[in-house]
């Protein structure tokens, strides 16, 4: 009993010490925040105008792809704003990000509630899949009904992840919360109306091609990138899923969240979200200070690392179930083979 208590105290102390080490980086520079937000949204606006007005479709396509990448970067800023990491007291930022939420299909009430739950429960074996992709253990899978297995496989299927514009942002983040609780998630209706009105207006004024290149295509690409980044950073080969009694915020950050190693260009477009283990440790660190925190805190410098290589992407999608006996993620095929061998 005494040794168990001492171990828990040690874990608690480690949590406090590591969190304390990150505190200096949780202080934003308002000037820097406005620079990165302002420049990103101006570039996004310019790219969207290019996608709408360029004289030839190949140029419009390039502008549309650029818009998608800038949408990803803008989303990270919206995400940081919702965590109160940047510009939390700014009224202009409040309006800017509310308008952006309609383009990105991310109503503030639904997003903030589910995402905060995710931060408080990521990596827990028995946590509900709120704000995250569902995760079953092999024991849960063994006991699950056929219908539950089908729903689980559909939710974690690559097409569901890559079709995130419809499956994640339209359905899970926006429409379903409103249908479940209209009075609480009234802003989801505003987001749906705003998003639909934007598409309809562009279609009426400029034709389907304008709506396609300005909203439909870039949102499809940006949502696929964003959904995969979120999936991969909590579903990878060397991750750990922890029982509630041994779960701590530090272990969730370092063992259940990955570091996505990217080149400088993709780090810029993804707003340093690859430093996900640090973000989960301290959500108040602005995205532009995450590399600084990693460089300064030795305990953050040996994370589980993944990349965007095809090998790593395939490996992430093969991480389907948590095997408590093996203490690792396994594929459906591995589970079936192991079950047949018993």
Task: Describe these PLM feature segments.
Residues 80-92:
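Helix-loop junctions on the outward
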Residues 227-265, 308:
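Membrane-interfacial segments at transmembrane helix termini in multi-pass membrane proteins
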């Amino acid at each position: 009993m005494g040794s168990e208590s001492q171990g828990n105290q040690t874990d608690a102390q480690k949590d406090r010490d590591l969190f304390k080490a990150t505190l200096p980086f949780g202080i934003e520079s308002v000037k820097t925040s406005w620079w990165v937000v302002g420049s990103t949204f101006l570039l996004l606006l310019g790219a969207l105008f290019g996608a709408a007005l360029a004289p030839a479709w190949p140029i419009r396509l390039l502008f549309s792809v650029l818009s998608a990448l800038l949408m990803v970067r803008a989303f990270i800023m919206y995400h940081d704003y919702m965590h109160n990491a940047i510009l939390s007291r700014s009224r202009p930022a409040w309006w800017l990000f509310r308008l952006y939420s309609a383009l990105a299909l991310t109503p503030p009430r639904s997003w903030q509630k589910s995402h905060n739950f995710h931060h408080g429960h990521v990596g827990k074996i028995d946590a509900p899949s709120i704000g995250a992709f569902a995760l079953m253990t092999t024991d849960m899978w063994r006991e699950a009904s056929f219908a539950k297995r089908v729903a689980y496989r559909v939710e974690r299927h690559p097409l569901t992840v890559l079709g995130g514009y419809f499956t994640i942002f339209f359905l899970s983040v926006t429409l379903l919360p409103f249908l479940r609780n209209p009075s609480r998630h009234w802003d989801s209706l505003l987001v749906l109306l705003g998003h639909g009105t934007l598409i309809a207006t562009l279609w009426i004024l400029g034709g389907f091609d304008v709506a396609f290149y300005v909203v439909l295509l870039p949102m499809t690409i940006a949502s696929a990138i964003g959904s995969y980044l979120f999936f991969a950073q909590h579903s990878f080969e060397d991750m750990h899923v922890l029982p509630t009694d041994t779960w701590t915020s530090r272990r969730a950050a370092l063992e259940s969240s990955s570091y996505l190693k990217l080149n400088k260009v993709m780090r810029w477009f993804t707003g340093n979200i690859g430093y996900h283990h640090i973000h989960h440790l301290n959500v108040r660190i602005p995205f532009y200070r995450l590399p600084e925190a990693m460089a300064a805190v030795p305990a953050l410098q040996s994370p589980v690392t993944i990349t965007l290589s095809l090998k790593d992407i395939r490996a992430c999608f093969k991480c389907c179930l948590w095997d408590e006996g093996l203490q690792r993620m396994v594929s459906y095929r591995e589970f079936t083979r192991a079950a047949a061998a018993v």
